Amino acid sequence: MTGFVLQVHIYQVSYVHVSTDLSVCLCGFLSVKRRNKNLLNNSEQEFVAGRRKTVLQALKKLKIQCSRQAVPNIALLGSGGAQRAMVGLLGSLVQREKAGLLDCILYLSGVSGSTWCMASLYKEPNWSTKLETVKEKIIERLSGPGVSLTDAMAKLKKYYYGKDFFSLTDVWAVLVVTSIVKEIDEHTLTEQRKQHNKDPFPIYAVIDKQSKQSNDGDPWFEINPYEAGYSLSGVFVDTGDFGSQFHKGSKIKHQDEFDMLYLQGKKILSQRNLSGGKSKLISTMNTADKRAEKQYIKRFAMDVCEDLSNAGISICKCMAQWIWGRKYNFLHNMTGENRPSTLLQSETRDYIDAGVLLNSPYFSVLREDRDIDLIISLDFSQGDPFMTVKDAAETCKKLKIPFPEVNITSEDKKKPKDFYVCCKLLYKHTPLFMFVCCLATICYNNNRF
């Protein structure tokens, strides 16, 4: 498997490679669905079956002999990290394609900045077959002019009048995310269902804010082209119906499917440096004092408003006391066994950036039914490069989910290696784990990457 240190510049992406032997590393519903444990959605099963054939051919090209039954399930994770993560993940995928490794990936999962990259890629049908061209289109867009204020305000009004719950997520998506990704992406995930049979299966991770705050229930929430739901609890709804109103498992009021711009808006909360920065925001979001949290969100929103043109400020201030990512709870008042009671009680739930809790989407691929053999984690986090993986290991231990031991020495902390391979076969389903340290700096040069 190839490990690397990423040196990310806005005008180029360069790599330092450390090679090892790849063969060594590879040792729509109208109601809510809850499937039996160890059973994927039928559409995902079909996708995975087809993708595994692609993986098998890719392994053969790399001179790795493998039977169809023994094809490894490999997941690539992209962490948060705002623009650093967006550019870093794009560069990583480009290099993997050049090395013949991209077609070995079964799942591609991301949080925060990595999802901005994913959203740009999955706009293009079968993007992995023309990645160099897609990369140039992304670079050209990011180097070009931003979204006009007129278009942004029109989109904000469309969000406001188009659904029951209009929150700060809509504001962030329209007024902040568009300033970074330089577009208003109105594609939806369900439109992608038949467009990516040659690409890895995409998973976008967020968290349930109420479950996070109460430390009860399942906070780990995932969204893919087919369904949205709780990764560990195993309760899902068709992605096209996520956000619609449900009662006892039946849809009673339809809401239009969210678009990709809105989804990217869920990925910025922990990335901005307003009113004291990321650490202060996360600390505030973790507090049990709801009044303090509301005051902080108000000041946070006001800071955003002050950075914007005077046009639309009044709209922003009206939203200063509002919340993030509110949707109807598709599990509201459901009955039956094996459904966490804490998820059934409220009519609405709030879904926010997963980076607030864990800055990489481990739990989307640690579902036992996905049977992952190898996890490749690209960490673009700012600060301690080991914090996320250590937090993931600790959480897995508490939840009794098989996860390799992560032993970081004092020398590693002073001088991280390019990558780490963790594997301790204590359990049948323990995946081999590869952690890649992505050291990144960002600078500007002639508005090019």
Q: Where do the model's predicted regions map?
A:
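C-terminal, well-structured subdomains that either form a transmembrane helix-short loop-helix hairpin
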Residues: P72-L90, P340-V389
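Amphipathic alpha-helical interaction motifs in eukaryotic regulatory proteins
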Residues: L56, L90-E97, L106, M118-K123, ...
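Low-complexity, highly charged intrinsically disordered N-terminal segments
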Residues: G3-Q65
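Patatin-like phospholipase A catalytic core
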Residues: L101, E124-P125, V134-S364, D371, ...
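Helix-rich "cap/lid" substructures immediately adjacent to catalytic or cofactor-binding pockets
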Residues: R52-I105
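Catalytic nucleophile loop
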Residues: S79-A82, C104-L121, Y204
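Short acidic, glycine/serine/threonine-rich loops at helix termini
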Residues: M118-K123, N215-G217, M387-K390
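Acidic, Ser/Thr-rich peripheral helices and adjacent loops at domain boundaries
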Residues: P125-S143, A292, S314, P385-T430
